[in-house]
């Protein structure tokens, strides 16, 4: 007695084999075509992967090129900054030395012109004589001092043209018969200037 299960399996295999044979007889190259299609698909996948890889490499190369350019520009800026900083430091040192030299020369020039005045004052104090002799010595010293100021281009501030707040300092306002208002009535302390620069304002009284 034949088992129905085995019979059914054999029947299925027979039918499947017959179908395969018919398919092959109708399309004898079907296996080759399937294989070619598979290879084409794989080839396409490889081409796609290669194109993507190529694009990534080009992008990476471009990025590296830009990075290198930026690095070079940064180094150039650093070098320029260092040069400017060094030049400024050298300029500052030269300027400081020049200022110091000018100040030293100016002090030396003033002292050279003032020391003879001190010498004459010391001589006047050392001489035994009358008050008149002392007065003459002081007058001579004053003239010498005025000459020294003139050599330094320092001049006395004038009060002849009336009160000027830029040049004079009013200590008091007074009434003075026969005088116009805003005139200098008396000078308490002389003022001096060098060019347009006021060294010391004149201390004065001013008329109403």
Swiss-Prot record:
PROSITE patterns named among the record's database cross-references: GRPE
Record-annotated membrane-spanning stretches: none
Gene3D superfamilies in alphabetical order: 3.90.20.20, Head domain of nucleotide exchange factor GrpE (2.30.22.10)
Single GO biological process annotation from the record: protein folding
Compositional bias of kind Basic and acidic residues: 1-25
GO cellular component: cytoplasm
Cystine bridges: none
Keyword Cell cycle on entry: no
UniProt similarity note: Belongs to the GrpE family.
Listed name of the protein: Protein GrpE
Organism: Clostridium perfringens (strain SM101 / Type A)
Gene from which the chain derives: grpE
